Amino acid sequence: MNTSNHTPEPDRAVPAHIDLDDPNDSTRTIYRLAPRDEEQALLDVARDYLESFLGKEDCNQRRSPHLRIAAVSTGRGQAAEAIAREFPSTSVLLWYIDLFHQQRSLQHCQIDGSENASQLPSNLSIRCLADLPEEKLDLAIVPLPHRGEQELTRDYLQQCYDRLEVGGTLIASVDNPKDKWLHDQLKLFEKSVRVREHKEARVYLVEKTKPLKKLKDFRCELAFRDCDELVQLITRPGVFSHRQLDNGARQLLDAVDVYPEARLIDIGCGSGSVSLGLAMRDSAATIHAVDSNARAIWCVEQGAVKNNLKNITTELNANGDYTQPGTFDMALTNPPYFGDFQIAEKLVLAALRSLRSGGRLVLVTKQPSWYQENLPRWFQDCEVFPSGRYHIASGIKPSSQIPPTPLSTIG
């Protein structure tokens, strides 16, 4: 298990029909996908567990008649969906921290298939939340990729285990049949960890015998200086640049000025370093922070409270059509470097929709060539210039009537 941010690999397509890269695009062909190895192995074990558990005559004496289950997923939530359909007396919560993945799974569960109804099971809830609800569970199922982010994995495991009733069971799996790391993590909860071997994965079962004595706080509080002000920042696992200020965010902050009454939008705000820094510069300006990650939005909101800022608003959004389009003076973003610039293009176009005529896009990148070539397709007066180990790219939304928003470059 390494420490890179967890981006699940694509599931394997099983012909049945929508490429869900955009969960809101109804024109694309949809496919029902088979679960990844770790999720399929976990599903097999969970089925056996539930068949045995629900078949016991005294099960209702040990649990409520409605078995409460929570699940995470490395794909489209196939294990949670299958359990909900096959065991209708259960109540299943499928939990994501990212709205894009939540919407993608919601759509996937409603695809017609040879063995699946086209409607979402009534006992399955698919939600995007920063944290698992503080509700008691009888079973938690947690498939994990061996290349996932360690702290996020530990956070998931701890939350799921903490929510279990005493006597409840955690079933976790990893796509590494020789795994030791996950096994060691589970032994921190209980000494007895049962193992189920699979060809492509390893599955573990842990029965909760006592409450956890202490919960580890995986959040991190740090501070950075911007324009002689100390900005307090809160980061969490699963949010970009956990436990540190991203250097790209620093370059973005250094590249722009804020003027009174300005309306700025921070697209893909992460933990909010750019939003918080700019909001502290001028209380008369307003900053709208948007992200698809519920934890990112949580971090920004908590950061605003910690810095006593009243001029920040937030929006959880995965489709790029943000509130109050065409009204912002400046859009700022730090696009990711993966995806052959497909994600970068979506963010640039989201900025274009958000800006007023004459508004300015400012972004930071380590790969300036694509922006030099493509920004002029949508913006005028485009600039790309070096900033430390990065480049700042900028352009103005076309208009002949409204003067452009000024850009202050670093010296």
Language-model features: locations:
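Non-catalytic substrate-recognition/targeting regions of SAM-dependent transferases
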Residues: 2-29, 174-243
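A short acidic, Gly/Pro-enriched loop at the edge of an enzyme's catalytic core
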Residues: 130-142, 320-331
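Short beta->alpha hinge that forms the Motif I/post-I loop of the SAM-binding pocket
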Residues: 97, 152, 291-296, 343, ...
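Class I S-adenosylmethionine-dependent transferase superfamily signal
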Residues: 83, 160, 278, 351, ...
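Conserved beta-strand signature within the Rossmann-like core of class I S-adenosyl-L-methionine
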Residues: 167-175, 358-365
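A short glycine-rich, Lys/Arg-flanked "PGG" loop and its adjoining helix->strand segment in the class I
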Residues: 154-166, 346-357
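Conserved SAM/SAH cofactor-binding pocket of Class I
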Residues: 34-121, 247-333
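Conserved proline-anchored active-site loop of SAM-dependent methyltransferases
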Residues: 139-150, 267-274, 328-340, 351
